[in-house]
Curated annotation (Swiss-Prot):
Carbohydrate attachment residues: N22
InterPro entries reported in the protein's UniProt record: Casein, Casein_beta
Taxonomic source organism: Sus scrofa
Keywords: Glycoprotein, Milk protein, Phosphoprotein, Secreted, Signal
Protein name: Beta-casein
Modified residues (Phosphothreonine): T27
């Protein structure tokens, strides 16, 4: 009986030892698993930190690149030809505005032709140069002196064409010893035929001769010409 009791106690002790060993093994396994989990977690944290550092460095580089002025792309880099619509050939051309041409009336044409036939073109005729005679100041004639001339001379002067004033040589002023009396110049006898018409008084002043003064020398003065006479 004692042997059986001892054997039971030994079996119980072995069972307890096995249980303790199993418990210790489980604890060891749990500890190892916990260590592995801790190492895995630590590795993950380290990798996350490395990734964050890499992202920060990349962001800093991109910020530095954007700070420099970059050439902006053109709005239209490639200009394409604008398509024009092709007009059909059956379209009529645009209506043109009629141009008004000035027309002359037959009466105006007749008047212009009649004037050309009545008034012929005048041609300048050579006028012989006559020697100039010195005159004293105050020798210009007035309209009252024209009455002295005869009527045929007046009629001949009416048809005379105004000619340019002849050029006379200029001399130095010379002192006069005595004042000569006023004399009437002879009327030139050369008369050029011209159609009868009224001559204005301003045209008569074109006939001028030089006048010799005591200080001024030669200067033009009006030549005696008869007033305009219009026969009825």
């Amino acid at each position: 009986m004692k042997l059986l009791i001892l054997a039971c106690f030994v079996a119980l002790a072995l069972a307890r030892a096995k249980e303790e060993l199993n418990a210790s093994g489980e604890t060891v396994e749990s500890l190892s698993s916990s260590e592995e989990s801790i190492t895995h977690i630590s590795k993950e944290k380290i990798e996350k930190l490395k990734r964050e550092e890499q992202q920060q460095t990349e962001n800093e580089r991109q910020n530095k690149i954007h700070q420099f002025p970059q050439p902006q792309p053109l709005a239209h880099p490639y200009t394409e030809p604008i398509p024009y619509p092709i007009l059909p050939q059956n379209i009529l051309p645009l209506a043109q505005v009629p141009v008004v041409v000035p027309l002359l009336h037959p009466e105006v044409m007749k008047d212009s032709k009649a004037k050309e036939t009545i008034v012929p073109k005048r041609k300048g005729m050579p006028f012989p140069k006559s020697p100039a005679e010195p005159f004293v100041e105050g020798q210009s004639l007035t309209l009252t002196d024209f009455e002295v001339l005869s009527l045929p001379l007046l009629q001949s002067l009416m048809h005379q064409i105004p000619q340019p004033v002849p050029q006379t040589p200029m001399f130095a002023p010379q002192p006069l010893l005595s004042l000569p009396q006023a004399k009437v110049l002879p009327v030139p006898q050369q008369v050029v035929p011209f159609p009868q018409r009224d001559m204005p008084f301003q045209a008569l002043l074109l006939y001028q001769d030089p006048l010799l003064g005591p200080l001024q020398g030669f200067y033009p003065v009006p030549q005696p010409v008869a007033p305009v006479y219009n026969p009825v």
